[in-house]
């Protein structure tokens, strides 16, 4: 079924910034997709086109991206009469029309908005759920429900506290199914709220951009201690493990790292990559830490490689790999990490996201599907994570409805699959292993 009409508009994300929404019409109806955006962005990401008109939305408007869709992409897709099930063909056409390495002509936010809407339309055209259509596009015969990684303590660029490391997460790997994982996550979250309130006062339980708490602590170890405490109080010490997203590029200073980067600059307190690696190893020794994302700067390749070889845990590349097949290939050959963080808006199309995922999986890596800090009510990544069988999803604390929208969609998928539902559980790093 061909595309009859495409119309884009500016809407708002969860931080009150404009973002792109696309309506795509076929004879089967209307298909709508909205594009997320990130706060800590890697320098190798596809370009998110903003207007930079300071008189409007502090320069963050996306009217140019919207115009590229309405005036250029839409007429091309309608006139070519492409079938919406031909995801790769449509994505390729948009990428070729853009003609730049990083999608800077139309903007990755323009191309992705259309790409997501096409994918939703393709599923209905085939008469299958979106997760099944995505599984077909990826060549997966089965689908798997992921372990949720709840980011419950926020620091770094996401929070106004002193904490350098950006995210402290809980993963309920011992749950029987996704619904139980959600219950465990919610109960630990509420216990954590009480633990923080008792120790730091009620105002320490205000939530950040991503629904997590941002108590004013400086020591990263203190965040782990709070988590351990809350997990124990909830009664789930045997079922919940911990993950971290350090986002170390944010505090990388000329070859070293500044764990107090939100205070006035003082080079005497910077630490070396080796000292930082030893700090991580002490966390792994003293707490159930099983996954660390972006432990070093996006260009500190040597530190990544040394750490991945010796840490014995999941090491996730986000700023390092930015969902970009070229960066992933380099990281694979250098053994820099062993898990890809998959963000559809870092690369800017469904087809390239699937390629990045398959490239990582075929090299024995894990893959974690992720939201962005500026989210919308769009639930595409819920179906994506199930269809791609990655076994793990990061869309933050069980708080704020733009986050819960994703979790609730996975609950519905689990219910729909019934007895066929498979939950990744403790195999979250490689759920397809036989």
UniProtKB/Swiss-Prot annotation:
The active site is at 210 (proton donor), 343 (proton acceptor). This is Alpha-enolase. Mg(2+) 1 binds at residue 40. Pathway: Carbohydrate degradation; glycolysis; pyruvate from D-glyceraldehyde 3-phosphate: step 4/5. It comes from Bos taurus. Belongs to the enolase family. The modification N6-acetyllysine is found at residues 5, 60, 64, 71, 89, 92, 126, 193, 199, 202, 228, 233, 256, 281, 335, 343, 406, 420. There is a cross-link at residue 202 (Glycyl lysine isopeptide (Lys-Gly) (interchain with G-Cter in SUMO2)).
